[in-house]
């Protein structure tokens, strides 16, 4: 089997996918922008061949690279980056070279919030009213029909970037002034719940869920952006059966194969409202957080299903796993040294956040496990408490 990785060097924690695929005897090929000498030794040794391009954004250059690797190594069986930024490139290359997996047409349902909402409804999962915004007349119609407050996001966009909270007439006017009309927006009724949770996991080549989990955000992505808070989220030991039912129905409706999924929900009392479906793993170091919570190795598990093997099971009970960040320029009540001494049994690893995430999420990320929710909440408080 020939497996082509787009951007095998970045993000660095995803290098482990390449390493584990190679450990399964799969021929792993890479195309990226970094010089070959910059690749880590383990990554270099796991790649059968690496083709450097000047610019991964130049699709013609990338296609020529794929054609060369195809000519030299034979048909390509998989093309994958696992990275939001390159999902469309992955899909167009799959279509051009007749490779298994999501094609550009398949991405429409995960790319546009308006399309996602249609499938959430088909899956029988609660949603809030929404409207596609292309003109100022659409803005006025949404205000009249949906009513304030609303949240405004690009219909095709990721995360909290270019997001507006619309509560007053002034907010509407500000949006109209700031809005580049070439960007289609999607307005939705604002949900007052500050509780966001997820249904995340992995499906095999037949679309069957082989792993699923859930985590809660301590703060919403919008709050992180506005208030520069420390990012904290935690994988839960147990999943609410209702959330599982909704998540499984959504995964079935979207019909993706041999990929990770990351679905976000608002929690409203004892019910949930679907927010968005991400056609890739949760960002940053979240796969490592899943691994610590469930005492397994998802990099290895993914390689196993690509190789046609069973997804490996774990005999260990899940635990809470907290991922909590700190900022280098913030002044905290407790020093890192004190916290790591207090939680030495629970502490797993400290990661330095890549520059791309640091401004929004913090400079350092700490992962800790515990069987106790009470202790986990105490850890969030201790790591996050700042001096007055």
Predicted feature locations:
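ATP-dependent carboxylate-activation loops
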Residues: 280-301
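A conserved helix-loop-beta module that forms one wall/lid of the active-site cleft
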Residues: 94-162
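Phosphate-binding core of ATP-grasp and ATP-grasp-like enzymes
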Residues: 179-184, 191-233, 241-273, 278-287, ...
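Conserved ATP-binding module of the ATP-grasp superfamily
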Residues: 126-128, 145, 149-152, 161-198, ...
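Short acidic-hydrophobic, aromatic-tinged amphipathic segments that line or gate anion-handling sites
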Residues: 50-57, 131-135, 164-167
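ATP-binding N-terminal substructure of ATP-dependent carboxylate-amine bond-forming enzymes
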Residues: 1-105, 371-388
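Peripheral (often C-terminal) accessory segments that flank ATP-dependent C-N-forming ligase machineries
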Residues: 301-388
């Amino acid at each position: 089997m020939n497996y082509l990785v787009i951007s095998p060097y970045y993000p660095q924690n995803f290098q482990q996918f390449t390493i584990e695929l190679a450990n399964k005897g799969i021929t792993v090929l890479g195309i990226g922008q970094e010089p070959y000498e910059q690749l880590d030794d383990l990554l270099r040794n796991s790649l059968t061949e690496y083709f450097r391009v000047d610019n991964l954004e130049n699709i013609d250059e990338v296609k020529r690279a794929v054609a060369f690797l195809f000519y030299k190594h034979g048909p390509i069986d998989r093309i994958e980056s696992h990275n939001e930024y390159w999902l469309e490139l992955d899909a167009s290359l799959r279509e051009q070279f007749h490779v298994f997996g999501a094609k550009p047409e398949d991405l429409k349902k995960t790319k546009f919030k308006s399309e996602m909402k249609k499938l959430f409804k088909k899956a029988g999962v609660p949603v809030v009213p929404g409207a596609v915004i292309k003109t100022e007349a659409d803005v006025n119609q949404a205000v009249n029909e949906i009513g304030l407050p609303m949240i405004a996001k690009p219909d095709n966009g990721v995360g909290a970037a270019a997001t507006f909270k619309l509560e007053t007439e002034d907010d509407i006017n500000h949006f109209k002034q700031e809005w580049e009309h070439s960007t289609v927006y999607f307005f939705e009724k604002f949900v007052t719940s500050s509780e966001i949770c997820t249904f995340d996991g992995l499906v095999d080549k037949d679309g069957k869920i082989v792993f699923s989990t859930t985590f809660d955000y301590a703060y919403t992505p919008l709050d992180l952006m506005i208030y520069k808070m420390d990012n904290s989220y935690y994988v839960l030991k147990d999943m609410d059966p209702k959330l599982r039912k909704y998540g499984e129905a959504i995964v079935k409706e979207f019909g993706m194969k041999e990929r990770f999924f990351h679905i976000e929900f608002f929690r409203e009392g004892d019910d949930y409202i679907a927010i968005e479906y991400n056609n890739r793993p949760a960002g940053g170091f979240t796969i490592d957080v899943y691994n610590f919570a469930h005492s397994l190795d998802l990099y290895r598990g993914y390689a196993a299903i690509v190789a046609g093997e069973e997804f490996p099971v774990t005999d260990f009970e899940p635990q809470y796993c907290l991922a909590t960040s700190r900022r280098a320029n913030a002044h905290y009540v407790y020093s890192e040294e004190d916290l790591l001494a207090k939680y030495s049994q629970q502490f797993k690893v400290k990661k330095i956040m890549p520059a791309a995430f640091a401004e929004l999420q913090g400079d350092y990320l700490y992962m800790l496990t515990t069987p106790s929710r009470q202790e986990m909440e105490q850890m969030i408080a201790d790591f996050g408490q700042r001096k007055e």
